[in-house]
């Protein structure tokens, strides 16, 4: 198998991304960490974060060993799976966990340095926080491309000269996405439960009952709250987007192998095209990172503009570069496919802007929630829920338009629904997802920046650095809240396109599983013609007809209902988990205020360790059931309802999960920034009736935006990945 010379750009981009991440890490570490008090607080947070991560990885390791043994049984005993799957699964989980580890290590070292830099200037604080966030962004894309390039080279050597080699290679590579998805779900759910248990506990007792400021060192839950920002928003988000990034590239490669199956040379070009777009995106992300800077006294809009310059210029350049890449590759309909990529990029920008509109206190929706605080917490909750529901409209319509346009651009606006037209159109949807995620190096940097700035503000408050420094860190923190909300919108949008591409890839995996079953002596009879069905020559419409995938089939309808229900079931379980953990935290903080004399007067030091322990134990205990449920549902549906039921499940999960995720993320973000707006002196300012009402809204919104909402991105992708990996089992036993 001849691998084109252009492919080598992928491992080169991977090495450069990891090298630049290391350079940014060294630059951050060379900055001064500040006063002894600042170092001490940063040390507490770092110790708590790393202790949690070690504990989480220990639990996840047991799950991975169990799943790898099941996959080995399926591959080597039952013979219903490719023998490389157990190994691919493990590497996907390993690299995802590694990205989270490096990101969190960087974030915990960066917070005190950001606060210290903010003592001198706003720009100094912004640069350290943003470049530290870039370590996470570049580590994710670097490790993702390294994993993809490594597996592609190994499998190309193993399967060279075989019939359907590229289809086998790409569908096998897809399975390492399940490893990444599983690790991501544990990171998101566990981290989300940890951070929100601490946050809710700190807010209810500290702000509402004891009337002390946020991040006050007298609050026993403060350190746990700061640790939680790292485990939830850095390690969790990194693992989530690592999975989307790899999933979009691999599913598009698999769809390309199918779309151009009759033209070997063109097939190879279609397979490496998404990898090359992602590789060029690395270079342009690095360029964009260097463009981010600001001036002293910058307003919120100035800060947003400085970040937007970096991300938007990177996106603009990757759009232009895509035309050149696909033209030089000589790929069929290169112009249409380039416009599909642009469609994905534009969709990402629109979803980001819509999220900013509904969650930033620079705009009316959040301002109205702040104003509702004047009449109490009930109206704040009602307004927030309404805002979250309204905010689903633009992202859903945007994704719908992006799906249609990318599909039609890629198949040359062929509306005949022929097999070739469908396969080319689906490839276009996949490559649109790659386009949306191609500048992940910088978009994830803006997201990881948020918790670093938040921790810097906490460090400044606990170290009592003075009003001017706190004002600067507050400005950076407010920007971080908006970038985090925008990043969540971006993550949800990319998850929807990736899940749709994975849905199409599932049919290809079923095809491979059926061919394997035929080689073992099994025969498939078409239910309508009663003739022997040959999957090797079958097209996408043929499979839909064979498995009777239509709305009149009750198996499909039942699958759709189960998929939609799964999203709500998952959210309910994670919300309840946060509620239970937060109750324990509230009781512990109240106990310390009651029993340790002198805490509120600042004469005694709270027991921070007990609160960290409560969050850690709760996260480990509560994350297992919802995470394992996400793995179990597709397997059970596959065996009971077959392929038609699984396709219904994935469609229902995608539609229900996407809409619910947007609602929860945006409602939570709006409540958070409504509280921030009041704290800036509006509607009575800190300590006022409106402030206490918006704190209640923010507390309700915390698990919305940081636990349940973001976890849904991974749920919809993980269900697709599990279905793909278990395709052989579904074909054999359904």
Where are these regions (language model features)?
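Hydrophobic packing and interface segments
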Residues: 1-734
């Amino acid at each position: 198998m001849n691998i084109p010379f252009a492919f080598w750009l992928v491992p080169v981009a991977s090495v450069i991304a990891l090298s630049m991440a290391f350079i940014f890490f060294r630059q951050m570490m060379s900055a001064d960490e500040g006063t002894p008090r600042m170092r001490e607080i940063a040390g507490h947070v770092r110790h708590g974060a790393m202790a949690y991560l070690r504990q989480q990885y220990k639990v996840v390791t047991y799950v991975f060993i169990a799943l790898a043994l099941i996959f080995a049984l399926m591959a080597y005993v039952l013979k219903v799976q490719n023998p490389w799957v157990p190994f691919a699964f493990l590497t996907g989980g390993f690299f995802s966990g590694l990205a989270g580890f490096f990101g969190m290590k960087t974030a915990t070292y960066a917070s005190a340095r950001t606060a210290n830099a903010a003592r001198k200037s706003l720009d100094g604080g912004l640069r350290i926080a943003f470049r530290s966030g870039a370590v996470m962004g570049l580590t994710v894309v670097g490790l993702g491309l390294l994993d993809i390039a490594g597996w592609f080279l190994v499998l190309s050597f193993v399967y060279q000269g075989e019939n359907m080699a590229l289809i086998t290679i790409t569908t096998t590579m897809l399975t390492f996405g399940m490893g990444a998805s599983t690790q991501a779900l544990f990171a998101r759910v566990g981290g989300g439960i940890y951070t929100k248990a601490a946050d809710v506990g700190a807010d209810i007792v500290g702000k509402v009952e004891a009337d002390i400021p946020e991040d006050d060192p007298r609050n026993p839950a403060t350190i746990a709250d700061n640790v939680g920002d790292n485990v939830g928003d850095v390690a969790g988000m990194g693992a989530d987007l690592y999975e989307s990034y790899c999933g979009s590239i691999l599913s598009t490669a698999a769809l390309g192998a199918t779309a151009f199956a009759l033209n070997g040379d063109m097939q190879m070009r279609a397979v490496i095209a998404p990898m090359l777009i992602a590789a060029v995106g690395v270079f342009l992300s690095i360029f964009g990172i260097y463009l981010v800077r600001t001036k002293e006294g910058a307003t919120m809009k100035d800060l947003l503009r400085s970040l937007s310059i970096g991300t938007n210029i990177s996106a603009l350049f990757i759009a232009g570069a895509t035309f050149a890449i696909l033209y030089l590759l000589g790929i069929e309909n290169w112009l249409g496919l380039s416009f599909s990529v642009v469609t994905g990029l534009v969709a990402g920008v629109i979803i980001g802007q819509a999220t900013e509109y509904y969650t930033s206190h620079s705009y009316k929706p959040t301002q109205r929630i702040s104003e509702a605080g004047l009449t109490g917490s009930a109206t704040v909750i009602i307004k927030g829920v309404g805002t979250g529901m309204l905010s689903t409209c633009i992202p859903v319509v945007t994704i719908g338009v992006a799906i249609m346009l990318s599909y039609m651009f890629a198949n040359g606006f062929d509306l005949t629904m022929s097999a070739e037209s469908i396969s080319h159109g689906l490839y276009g949807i996949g490559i649109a997802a790659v386009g949306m995620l191609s500048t992940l190096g910088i978009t994830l940097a803006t997201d990881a920046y948020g918790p670093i700035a938040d921790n810097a503000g906490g460090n400044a408050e606990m170290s009592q650095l003075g009003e001017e420094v706190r004002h600067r860190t507050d400005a950076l923190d407010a920007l971080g809240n908006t970038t985090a909300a925008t990043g969540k919108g971006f993550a949800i949008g990319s998850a929807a396109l990736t899940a749709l591409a994975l849905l199409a890839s599932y049919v290809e995996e079923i095809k491979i599983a059926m061919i394997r079953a035929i080689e073992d002596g099994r025969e498939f009879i078409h239910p309508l013609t009663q003739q022997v069905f040959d999957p090797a020559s079958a097209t996408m419409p043929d499979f839909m007809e064979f498995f009777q995938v239509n709305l009149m089939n009750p198996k499909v309808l039942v699958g759709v209902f189960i998929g939609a229900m799964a999203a709500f079931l998952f959210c309910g379980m994670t919300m309840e988990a946060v509620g239970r953990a937060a109750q324990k935290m509230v009781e512990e903080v109240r106990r310390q205020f009651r029993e340790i004399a002198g805490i509120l007067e600042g004469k005694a030091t709270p027991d921070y360790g007990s609160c960290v322990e409560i969050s850690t134990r709760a996260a480990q205990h509560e994350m297992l059931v919802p995470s394992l449920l996400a793995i179990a549902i597709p397997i059970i549906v596959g065996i009971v309802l077959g392929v038609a039921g699984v396709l219904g499940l994935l469609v229902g999960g995608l539609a229900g999960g996407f809409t619910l995720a947007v609602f929860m993320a945006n409602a939570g973000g709006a409540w958070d920034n409504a509280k921030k707006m009041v704290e800036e002196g509006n509607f009575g300012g800190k300590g006022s009736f409106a402030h206490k009402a918006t704190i209640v809204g923010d507390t309700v919104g915390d698990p919305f935006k940081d636990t349940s909402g973001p976890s849904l991105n991974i749920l919809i992708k993980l269900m697709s990945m599990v279905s793909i990996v278990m395709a052989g089992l579904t074909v054999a036993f359904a």
